[in-house]
Amino acid sequence: MAKAKFERTKPHCNIGTIGHIDHGKTTLTAAISKVLHDKYPELNEESPFDQIDKAPEERQRGITISIAHIEYQTEKRHYAHVDCPGHADYVKNMITGAAQMDGAILVVAATDGPMPQTREHVLLARQVGVPAIVVALNKCDMVDDEELIELVEMEVRELLTSQEFDGDNCPVVRISAFQALQGDEKWTQSILDLMDAVDEYIPQPERDLDKPFLMPIEDVFTITGRGTVVTGRVERGVVKTGEEVEIVGIHEKTQKTTVTGVEMFRKILDEGRAGENVGVLLRGTKKEDVVRGMVLSKPGSTTPHTDFEGQVYVLKKDEGGRHKPFFSHYSPQFYFRTTDVTGTVELPEGTEMVMPGDNTDMTVHLIHPVAMEDQLKFAIREGGRTVGAGRVTKIIK
């Protein structure tokens, strides 16, 4: 079997299945894989159910998450699809962003309708900025009453609208993932209809390359006769020799400088692109003016802040987290991109304390400014070990 070449010709999109336990998320993931494999065998391998269900554990920022990654192609797009077997894995994945989602397929069993985790996943999807949701109304082969299915569909649309998604217009596709896996023709077609809806309704994400340049600085050193070099992995955008950039964060003032060279593996490049580890040579910048934790960015594209609201998952003791709860005025380190900055936590009114395993909102004040934007991820650490993971939900100042 020749190794398939990753074709860059199709736009790429990251999606995931969300929804209540036992409503058929993993069965649907397997069904999509099988149906697309049968329709486009040269484009798609098949991922069987048990392979997805026994998802490998991944460690993200010291948090163990079981997550299954599969890929498949429709005629229009290349997809990376994530499925988490356990509910706790979902919550952790959504908050830590272990697997980014450009859109989600909400699986709701027509036999049950929306359940508590259905609501929780939709709320999480909104909080973490998932732009669009397509609904897969599953197990429709088990419901004979058309009115009952219509009722469930109405409930799901209302739920989506209540969480600021477009409940009126989002596609709701009636499927049976189990029957599609068995090869039933009618239900196989329902899976193809679902993927057509995903192709059409989930917007094409802006590629990292097209976003404004940003590189978190990992290291700084001097090359005699040439100046100061900062190294790191380009998070987004492109940086070219001769361009003006800003150095943002940690210090009160943002510095402006010009890129005089870009290097990768000791080779001189014209530019550094998203995803690449590069060294960037800066004109007239002193080594002592730059520290790890700052970012190099396109002028005006990111700003330094000290106060923000965040949503945080607090690790349980058996995940290596704290053994005891914490209260307001707790002062751990907040790890943004490449560095720790001490911050003080204020819990929301009515929340006395936060226990290991909780999911909470908090307001944080950092002692140094950090280049940040909405949805930026961070870890909470104590003495170098991760005790929580979160993302910025609102910048205060």
Swiss-Prot record:
Residues 10-206 form the tr-type G domain. It catalyses: GTP + H2O = GDP + phosphate + H(+). Keywords: Cytoplasm, Elongation factor, GTP-binding, Hydrolase, Magnesium, Metal-binding, Nucleotide-binding, Protein biosynthesis. GO terms for molecular function: GTP binding; GTPase activity; translation elongation factor activity. Mg(2+) binds at T26. Pfam families: GTP_EFTU, GTP_EFTU_D2, GTP_EFTU_D3. Residues 19-26 are annotated as: G1. Its EC number is 3.6.5.3. It comes from the Bacteria. InterPro entries: EF-Tu_GTP-bd, EF-Tu_GTPase, EFTu-like_2, EFTU_2, G_TR_CS, P-loop_NTPase, Small_GTP-bd, T_Tr_GTP-bd_dom. CDD domains: EF_Tu (cd01884), EFTU_II (cd03697), EFTU_III (cd03707). It is found in: Cytoplasm. It is an enzyme of class 3 (hydrolase). Residues 176-178 are annotated as: G5. The keyword Transit peptide does not apply. Belongs to the TRAFAC class translation factor GTPase superfamily. Classic translation factor GTPase family. EF-Tu/EF-1A subfamily. GTP hydrolase that promotes the GTP-dependent binding of aminoacyl-tRNA to the A-site of ribosomes during protein biosynthesis. This is Elongation factor Tu. It comes from Cutibacterium acnes (strain DSM 16379 / KPA171202). The lineage of its organism: Bacteria, Bacillati, Actinomycetota, Actinomycetes, Propionibacteriales. The gene is tuf.
